[in-house]
Structures are given as structure tokens and as C-alpha cells.
Amino acid sequence: MERIASFCVDHTRLDRGMYLSRQDGDVLTWDIRMKKPNHGDYLSTGAAHTLEHLFATYARNSQYKDGVVYVGPMGCRTGFYLLTRGLTPAEALRLTVESFRFMAAFEGDVPGASEVECGNYRDMDLPAAKAEAAAMLPLLEALTADDLHY
């Protein structure tokens, strides 16, 4: 079998940030790396799950909603993938920054966190999710579209 593209990224050199991971036709895959790989600090499952619900809800209700294909966590718990169509790198970055601001400040019930709406609704940790989003925000806010490469 061929090695998939995400396994071709040298994780020993990868740091926190936002990167264009790949382009498949008109779909761009963004690597939103919240944790340095293999350094022992990972997103907890509760924080990652909560961030997933908040990020997906915000992105799919934003001005960029028609360009959002998918938002989801990495299995290694070091970040998220954002798949977009028709958004420029600057727009994808703006969407990500706005999403992280939303998540860092979120108060209330986590969207989709009920037995009817989610397959593991009890595994949520809003305080941890907010802290993780707040910790990532300064890094994202300092980026420009020209910085979004490995």
C-alpha cells in the first residue's frame, strides 16, 4: 500500500500552527496543530470532543459556511483538520481565528451534547476546551496567509 500524505509529514519537525496539509481538486485540507507531536501533552478526549462540537457548529454557521466541508479532530489528539472548498487561505485562517475566539469565550450548553444528538455526549469538558482554544489563539492571530505551509 502507498503511504498516505499525512504520514509523509515529518512529525519530529512539526510545531503548533496552521498548515495547508493537502489539496485534492478544489478541497483544501488544513492541519490545525494545537500540540507539538510526540511531546507528551495532548488534547484530552473531553476537550477535543467539546472543541469538535463548538468548532463545527461555529464554522457551519459562519459567513464561510458554504465553504466548510468538514471539521474534525486528529486521532493523535494534537489538533484538528478543517476541509474547505472555495475559500482562500486568508479566509480559512480568518474562519479558524474566529472559531477559536468563539470557543475560548463560549458559555452555555455545548451544541449537540445530548443523548439524541451525540454518540458519546457525556465525554465533554467545556472548561478544558476553552483553555485549549485560548492557548492556541495568540499563535493563530499572529499568522498570515503566507505562513500556512509546513
Feature map (PLM): residue ranges:
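Short, low-order "capping/linker" segments at domain edges
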Residues: G119-D146
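Short amphipathic alpha-helical signal-transduction/dimerization elements
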Residues: A56-Q63, F100, A104
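Non-catalytic beta-strand/loop surface segments
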Residues: M1-T29, R60-P73, R77-Y81, M136
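M16 family metallopeptidases and their MPP-like homologs
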Residues: V68-R101
